[in-house]
Amino acid sequence: MSKNSKAYRAAAEKVDRSNLYTPLQAAKLAKETSSTKQDATVEVAIRLGVDPRKADQMVRGTVNLPHGTGKTARVAVFAVGEKADAAVAAGADIVGSDDLIEKIQGGFLDFDAAIATPDQMAKVGRIARVLGPRGLMPNPKTGTVTPDVAKAVADIKGGKINFRVDKQANLHFVIGKASFEENKLAENYGAAIDEVLRLKPSASKGRYLKKITVSTTTGPGIPVDPSVTRNFTEA
């Protein structure tokens, strides 16, 4: 939905920009202001009170959303032998080693997440410049460098999301689809916020959750009250 379209302007008029909504109210409003032509993704953007230029203020983590994301992620796995077989059995979409690396070097990027066994990381490092900027580089901190590839595949397929603060101290992550019931969106939101709060760097001073906005890919931003850090499904 173009921001200049009549439909977008009508949707934006439903949002009181001077108000801070509860997570449940924001979820309901996101559903109401989304385009009806497609099942839009519901996203959260957070401005954190950290300085991401400092190593001790980096915020990066994963969380399993209780109701999933509404999308079955395509997963690539770098593994060989029994580990490769386990990845295939767990539902990985593409599994390989040197052959997969060559395919990616040739432009293949038709996957949403990548997992690697530890012994494959020296090889995967050859495509770090391709995977890294796209948030696809396997990393032990997010559980995507692991000998237990079957569990990692199952977690991602089941609704596990990754998040990482960017250079402007913003976090972005998905909490579901506009077709979700608002209480399920609020519960997914709560699970993610709980993890973001748990990861607060000790070096972060002042307000940690400075600004939060919920929106769909086709709708306006909805300001959420950052002080609501429990009872996420209450209006």
Curated annotation (Swiss-Prot):
Keyword match Ligase: no
Organism of this sequence: Mycobacterium marinum (strain ATCC BAA-535 / M)
Matches recorded under SUPFAM superfamilies: Ribosomal protein L1 (SSF56808)
Pfam family, one: Ribosomal_L1
Oligomer status and interactors: Part of the 50S ribosomal subunit.
Protein name (database record): Large ribosomal subunit protein uL1
Key words of the record: Repressor, Ribonucleoprotein, Ribosomal protein, RNA-binding, rRNA-binding, Translation regulation, tRNA-binding
GO BP, one annotated term: regulation of translation
Cited function: Binds directly to 23S rRNA. The L1 stalk is quite mobile in the ribosome, and is involved in E site tRNA release. Protein L1 is also a translational repressor protein, it controls the translation of the L11 operon by binding to its mRNA.
Domain of life: Bacteria
Stretches of the chain forming a coiled coil according to its record: none
HAMAP family in alphabetical order: Ribosomal_uL1_B
UniProt similarity note: Belongs to the universal ribosomal protein uL1 family.
GO molecular function terms noted in the UniProt entry: rRNA binding; structural constituent of ribosome; tRNA binding
PROSITE patterns in the record: RIBOSOMAL_L1 (PS01199)
InterPro entries in the record: Ribosom_uL1_bac-type, Ribosomal_uL1, Ribosomal_uL1-like, Ribosomal_uL1/biogenesis, Ribosomal_uL1_3-a/b-sand, Ribosomal_uL1_CS
One GO cellular component term: large ribosomal subunit
Protein encoded by which gene: rplA
